[in-house]
């Protein structure tokens, strides 16, 4: 039986943690504490040091100095195996599953014999409301389900310290509520949770304490109930931010190439009764100079539709018209040359070559247009142009994409798509897992792109994002678009959610 003194000990106490990369101080004497049964939310801007701190706690990266006190014992450094033995589990922002193994094999992989319990796994699946076929390949899951599998892996390991990095980034509101219910059950058993997120309403809903990191330090820390939203946002982004791109940024962002210019409102991409894997009888028109929102719950068929438009999946019926010409039989490369560009939702597995240089990644879609040999100087100049336009933070063009923060990786992916001179740009979850500051940058960027008469199809599970950004909105429900486009005052979160859940009655906007 534990004494009161033992119970009072924090699960985790990081003291004076320092870390440096290539002479740059990433962490500057961080102190961070997590108690039993507590959710401690960790926020911060792009490159604030959140991921580095969590990697040190999880044993992935060693600290230069400082100590970790876990269960009353001090450690100068940990390995991943040792961290697991101490009950620490990091659920990454980008799920790291074995795609060729089954869901069951992924959940049980690496477990000690005493933790191998099929009944326990089935109970957890039922508690989370997961309808998985355990024998299906993990590679067949969408991002939201892969996130759930990662969380299950941590819970199956009897983790006492659970680190969740943007766990709800790809979850629907219903899935988020289900996850939070399960987390509350874990908290009741004494588990402590570090919750990394940029969604302030969710943080206020679940977190007991909040710490904000900025420039490698803790800029703000306290009880959630005692911190105002203004305090938190000011701590994350102290500098005054512009509401639109500066004139200099707009100059650098002028799209390259001899891209055909369409008049505003000209149909660029038209879908006529499309049917494919995960959707059926979808019709819509995307016009030049507009941002068309495509909303819906996870599993509604939006990503499947986008991948079919780009030629990554087989079209079973209907016609795709780009600039008035049918492109059904064209390859992905041919569609790209015609001006159809796709930004996928999973930047790490589908969007970027993480081991290639930043300059190579930005120019990856246009290399074949420049001849057989890569032109390093030209690639570097292209990267520099987008660095100025998008505020991308990096040290040198040759560094690998995997060395950047998630927000900067997303900006590199956007730059890659823009360099292909799009006429129609499909962006799937463009702000998933990026910080408040970078999210604002991306919003400004999308508006600037549309202002150059590019037709933008915005796919997002964030209904507030759709409301903020879209000129018109279509909502998919179970693979179909059952309503005409929402416009004007009908573009609001409540109406979008009603349609997404299959409500046939559209609620009128209030006066």
UniProtKB/Swiss-Prot annotation:
Protein's membrane topology: Peripheral membrane protein
Location of the ABC transporter domain: 12-240, 264-503
Family the UniProt entry places it in: Belongs to the ABC transporter superfamily. AI-2 autoinducer porter (TC 3.A.1.2.8) family.
One MF term in the entry's GO annotations: ATP hydrolysis activity
Catalytic activity entry: ATP + H2O + (2R,4S)-2-methyl-2,3,3,4-tetrahydroxytetrahydrofuran-[AI-2-binding protein]Side 1 = ADP + phosphate + (2R,4S)-2-methyl-2,3,3,4-tetrahydroxytetrahydrofuranSide 2 + [AI-2-binding protein]Side 1
Protein name per UniProt: Autoinducer 2 import ATP-binding protein LsrA
Keywords on record: ATP-binding, Cell inner membrane, Cell membrane, Membrane, Nucleotide-binding, Repeat, Translocase, Transport
A Pfam cross-reference name: ABC_tran
Top EC group: translocase
Biological role stated in the UniProt entry: Part of the ABC transporter complex LsrABCD involved in autoinducer 2 (AI-2) import. Responsible for energy coupling to the transport system.
CDD domains with a match to the protein in the record: ABC_Carb_Monos_I, ABC_Carb_Monos_II
Record-linked InterPro entries: AAA+_ATPase, ABC_carbohydrate_import_ATPase, ABC_transporter-like_ATP-bd, P-loop_NTPase
Residues the entry annotates as binding ATP: 44-51
Lineage: Bacteria, Pseudomonadati, Pseudomonadota, Gammaproteobacteria, Enterobacterales
Subcellular location: Cell inner membrane
Biological source species: Shigella flexneri serotype 5b (strain 8401)
Assembly description: The complex is composed of two ATP-binding proteins (LsrA), two transmembrane proteins (LsrC and LsrD) and a solute-binding protein (LsrB).
EC number: 7.6.2.13
GO CC annotation, single: plasma membrane
